[in-house]
Amino acid sequence: MLFDVKAPILGFETIHKMHLQKVDEIFLRLNSAEDNSVVSFTLVNPFALRKYEFEVPTPLKILLELEGAKSVLIANIMVVQTPIELSTVNYLAPLIFNLDKQLMGQVVLDSNKYPHYHLRENILSHTHE
């Protein structure tokens, strides 16, 4: 599915279109959809790994037209390592997808408000909660 990037991924501010592909119930691939860019991310469904909740800031709700949206997806960027157990997840900067309108953006959460989320957490650190 092709998405318009309304709130850019940090460090990739020049990318305005991205393609999201579901791998399975836990993993997804996010690739740039522009000819001049070869950017690819592995994403993970945070709810499959841990209890995860946060408040979406109002400006991002407006940008992504989340009010009244029926299909919203939250995913987090994962840094894949070998073996997979060494992989890390960025829980502090989730990606939000409005599947109805094909809009997406990244929100950086306030670490003071969400001290239990970090930029690099081991993928297995919450699997037994």
Curated annotation (Swiss-Prot):
Q: Which GO terms describe its biological process?
A: bacterial-type flagellum assembly; regulation of translation
Keywords linked to the UniProt accession: Bacterial flagellum biogenesis, Chaperone, Cytoplasm, Translation regulation
Localization, per the record, is: Cytoplasm
Q: Which domain of life is it from?
A: Bacteria
Look up keyword Signal and say if it applies: no
| Main localization category | cytoplasm
Task: State the family it belongs to.
Answer: Belongs to the FliW family.
Describe the function of this protein. Answer: Acts as an anti-CsrA protein, binds CsrA and prevents it from repressing translation of its target genes, one of which is flagellin. Binds to flagellin and participates in the assembly of the flagellum.
Q: What name does UniProt use for this protein?
A: Flagellar assembly factor FliW 2
Gene behind the chain: fliW2
